[in-house]
Amino acid sequence: HEAALFALDAHPKLPAAPSLPRRSATEGMVAQAAWGIPGVMVLDDGSLLVDEAAIDPAAPLVDGGVGGEPFVGLRAFLEVLAGRVGPFKLQLTGPLTLALALHAVGVDADRAFAVAGKAVTARIGAALAAARRAAPGATPVLFLDEPGLTAALDPGFPFELESALDLVSSAMALVEESAIAGLHCCGRADWQAVLQAGPQILSLPVGAGAVEHAGALAGFLERGGWIAWGAVPTDGPLTMAADVLWRHLWAEWDGLTAAGCDPVLLRQRAIITPACGLVGFEPRQAEQVSALAAHLAQRLESQSLGTGVDLGA
């Protein structure tokens, strides 16, 4: 509950459901996603023990809901925001990343692919149903976390790129039926390919190669897409001041503008976030990261208003 209240206080416009793997390793992204798959045991340390003979793509999840140990943070969050009418953010591990994790512990690539798609589909439905019960008047934003997309063009990638994108796209389409669909990828990727999965919001870190795919991002913005810019690094000590982070963000936008992106749309359709999750931080450090992201967002809003740019909602 403390983490849920922190999320509401730190990001009142779009609070995010916390995952708490330091409370229980089963809340780690792979463990959480694999929970309930027949033939997969999630151990207390979050690792997976697989009985490959029991892996069956046709079998339903043993536990496909959000009532188990891996979803304590989510349930606390939904309890705290009960009755909310403003948007809020949920996140689940995407099917491609789960498929890669299953394959890494010995599941045949084709079966891992099929099982992961079904598991994530079931979990999306359960999470959004729980969100509707908690806040029927609100529109949730559900992000699929797909770090696996950073490896999609590597020579040893076990799946065809088109099939991988179709897998993610199918999950995105399900989300979009009752929520705003976001896609988070926490490293450098082929953003033109990633956008083929069809997110309404793309979340990526500043400095992750966006300028190399300016044309694809320009088209995405023109079609109504939003970009969540991970402008506050979360992969090490907090050593950069807000002014430095602002300059990094502005330099990225300058590069995109020079490559053809509409500078007004870049700012109108921007969300400022930490680069990734806060699992490695103590509460005081998490507060600092959140405060930096809020400061950058307020600075963007102030400068945009000063130049007549309408940031909308």
Model-derived segments and spans:
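Alpha/beta catalytic barrel-like cores
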Residues: 1-109, 200, 225, 253-261, ...
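Active-site loop segments of alpha/beta catalytic cores
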Residues: 90, 105, 111-212
